[in-house]
Swiss-Prot record:
Residues 1-21 form a transit peptide. This is Small ribosomal subunit protein mS29. Residues 52-66 have a biased composition (Basic and acidic residues). Ubiquitous. Changing residue 395 to Y: In PRLTS7; likely pathogenic; decreased thermal stability; decreased GTPase activity.
Amino acid sequence: MMLKGITRLISRIHKLDPGRFLHMGTQARQSIAAHLDNQVPVESPRAISRTNENDPAKHGDQHEGQHYNISPQDLETVFPHGLPPRFVMQVKTFSEACLMVRKPALELLHYLKNTSFAYPAIRYLLYGEKGTGKTLSLCHVIHFCAKQDWLILHIPDAHLWVKNCRDLLQSSYNKQRFDQPLEASTWLKNFKTTNERFLNQIKVQEKYVWNKRESTEKGSPLGEVVEQGITRVRNATDAVGIVLKELKRQSSLGMFHLLVAVDGINALWGRTTLKREDKSPIAPEELALVHNLRKMMKNDWHGGAIVSALSQTGSLFKPRKAYLPQELLGKEGFDALDPFIPILVSNYNPKEFESCIQYYLENNWLQHEKAPTEEGKKELLFLSNANPSLLERHCAYL
């Protein structure tokens, strides 16, 4: 057996449970296995795994299952945050950032290309089982919008705003809410990196007073508000609220198209791990950051789109196998987002599975002598059930 020597190690990391796989059961696994038996090697491995078309706007069905390259410059400006940690490790290991073109992202790109900005923003929701690639599909969409010169409002993990926060301060604006200055300041730095070209063009439409000595006058660049939040960390939460309010208000003027992209959207409803000094729990709506982000999720503005993804990884107080919108959002969250267009992200299909294996082989990530064989591929299929995250983790040990 190809993986005999590492079975014990793998089992420590993830005990395989056939009951875990809801969408991709025995039938689907057998389908991919049959594909591996019957495939005819008419294309080179590189043609299977890669495309030379690196512009997301030009991606179509013909590119499905192939990897495209994100330039180092785009990686630095579009994704100062938001890429999954293990994908970042892979980028460093392979010295390149390659995303697979998948059907959920292609569906979203089709919708966004045909957006009518005169109508209220449409909400799209990526959902699926754990490890199927929701975050990377969201990143594909973000890359597309950035290359189309949209302004990107990206929240890479909303769960970080509702748990394990180091500093909570009573809001100076509303005593019933709490500020999270460190989280807000970090987000503003990344927002500035991605959208710096817009920050001098957009002017604030009212005066904002920070303290007795400092204020931002009406007509000042939005960049001044961002800088205030970065340099005066105590004001960072208020600065985020102002940025969101100004963008929502001005998106209809036609100066820019706005993408609101939120990963882990289910964090905005439900429970938090945060407590007051008297140990009583803090509700999400009591956090100023969450309060303001919830406003952005309403489709009472136009000039852009709202794309979000559900996440089990950081979700609190939810069953491990929950993945459906009504399960992770709860009634309050579901009602708040309704209506939305749901987009399912599933495990790899046969073409995607083969492409992923070939990509790892090209980068010498699979060193075992049986890795390129049909027997080896079937073992990897059995171990991972074609789940992208599990496949990546198992391949890391070969």
